[in-house]
A protein has these predicted regions:
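Alpha/beta-hydrolase superfamily serine-hydrolase fold, recognizing
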Residues: 65, 69-75, 79-312
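A glycine/proline-hinged amphipathic helix-loop "lid/cap" segment
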Residues: 1-80
Length: 312
């Protein structure tokens, strides 16, 4: 059912498996503390977390190589048949402050298996131990390296949550620079406004089992550093219309029980207004980055649509 020319509601009610996953998640220790004070205390006392290791079976299932860009680790996975026609540069989420989660690896595998793509995963250094500039340098260097051996128009930028922010920010930097451009942009529940300024987000917060507005604002300030979190540089939702008009075809997937749904709708509308081929797919009662739970009906539909987008 189409609600607007650019927004498509993909489910009217959640699958039983997704409801079960949400119930389990709601009873676990949250990924991020739920109050600003708890988050600040956690960040001040934490031991720097490490990236979840890639499952050992991946080495048998895919052709895997590890390399460095901007002094940081990068992993590339090809199907056993060899490098694919399309190469996905995928940035994992984690609020810029958390490394690769174990749940991200099955999503990487599912994208390779369903879409037949090669995938490169930058394992970027996190803030505040590192900085936004270090993360941006890695993104820039990784794309430049891939573009040396692969047609840039056959590179798709992808990311979830803060990783969606990184993919989009990279696309905007490349557009402004005017050099080689990626062919497509796929965003899973992207974080678009670090300040979480829209009051409508407050109505979604009671339904979001992962994210809280105050904690996200703290993460955003930490990532922005000396910059203004509300600037177009830090919050792509506020990028200029001129810059947005330069973006490649874009698809966005966000659950309706995700704080980011409000800004996803606004951003898709902005892209449409400036002439970008953009679509937003929404899922009833789906939580933040629901597609990482790959056995669910909703995740399978996301991957189906991603495959169709790549094939267009």
């Amino acid at each position: 059912m189409l609600t607007t020319p650019i927004t498509q509601i993909r489910s009217q009610k959640p699958s039983l498996l997704l409801k079960t996953v949400k119930w389990v998640m709601s009873r676990r220790t949250p990924v991020f503390p739920h109050t600003s004070a708890e988050f600040r205390e956690y960040m001040a006392s934490r031991t720097l977390p490490l990236d979840a290791p890639m499952p050992s079976k991946f080495a048998q299932k895919y052709d895997v190589s590890e390399w460095e860009a901007a002094g940081q680790k990068v992993v590339t996975l090809h199907p056993k048949s060899g490098p694919a026609e399309w190469h996905m540069l995928y940035f994992h989420g984690g609020g810029f402050v958390r490394p690769m989660f174990k749940e991200h690896w099955p999503l990487v595998a599912a994208m390779i298996d369903t879409c037949g793509v090669s995938v490169t995963v930058p394992l970027y250094e996190v803030v505040p131990e590192s900085s936004h500039q270090v993360q941006d340098d890695l993104a820039d260097a990784a794309f430049a390296k891939l573009a040396e051996s692969h047609d840039p128009q056959k590179i798709i930028l992808n990311g979830d949550s803060a990783g969606g922010h990184m993919a989009l920010s990279l696309a905007l930097r490349l557009a402004r620079a005017g050099g080689p451009q990626p062919g497509k942009l796929a965003l899973f529940a992207p974080w678009l406004d670090l300040t979480m300024a829209d009051p409508a987000i407050e109505a979604v917060e009671p339904h979001d089992i992962m994210l809280k507005i105050g904690t996200l604002r703290e993460c955003g300030r930490m990532f922005a550093g000396a910059r203004d979190p509300a600037s177009g540089e830090c919050s792509p939702l506020f990028a200029s219309s001129e810059d947005l008009s330069l973006l490649p075809p874009t698809r966005i997937w966000t659950g309706q029980h995700d704080l980011f749904i409000v800004d996803s709708r606004k951003f898709a509308a902005r892209l449409n207004e400036v002439g970008v081929d953009a679509k937003l797919y929404e899922y009833a009662e789906a939580p933040h980055v629901f597609m990482a739970v790959v056995p669910t009906r909703e995740a399978k539909d996301t991957l189906k649509l991603l495959n169709e987008f790549i094939a267009e």
